[in-house]
Amino acid sequence: VTASPPHLVIRPIEARDFAAVSLITVESYRPFIRPDDDYFALLADTERRASASEIVVAEVSGQVVGSLTMVEWGSPYADVAQQDELEFRMIAVNPRARGHGVGTALVEYGIRVARARGRSRVVLSTMDVMVEARRIYDRLGFAEAPDRRWHPAISVLTFPLHRGATGQRSQQNSADDPRKVTESRDF
């Protein structure tokens, strides 16, 4: 008898998820940020972030294992978004859930949200030392935008969503409207 693979669900965050998302986000960023950095307070304040942005969680077998924060241009949480772009912030996956496609599923979900909203591109900042995350972004077709780099250790990556774009997954599919369904899949 073989066990079924865990079932992954991506859904909007609920208040009951705030503590888990805070913990996962802080733990995900801990290896890359100095312990005394004020950024930890921002990472941990999921409730406040949820009031000014859109957060989705990845859940496996009823447990939150990751999250993605999406912000529009002009949001207090937008760092690099320009008009007509959707910015991804604070992408986090529980270290024990890594390597199972959770991060990729969250990023792909966010890309579908951006397409459904008619945005021209997705944009995000990432640290060069976040090797696992960079592999996901590179594999999906994100490209570095050196002219938008705002810190020597942080890259700005973009993913074009318009027709003829260079990203591997740039073809729009009208069935991919994330507002209509909560994504779930086995991994």
Regions found by a protein language model. Give the residues of each.
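Generic N-terminal simple sequence motifs
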Residues: 1-2, 174
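C-terminal "cap" of GNAT-fold acetyltransferases
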Residues: 7, 24-27, 55-56, 84, ...
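Extreme N-terminus of proteins, especially the signal/transit-peptide cleavage junction
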Residues: 2-8
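Conserved glycine-rich acetyl-CoA-binding loop
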Residues: 90-108, 115-117, 128-135, 139
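Conserved phosphate-binding and hydrolysis motifs of nucleotide-dependent enzymes
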Residues: 62, 66, 101-103, 141
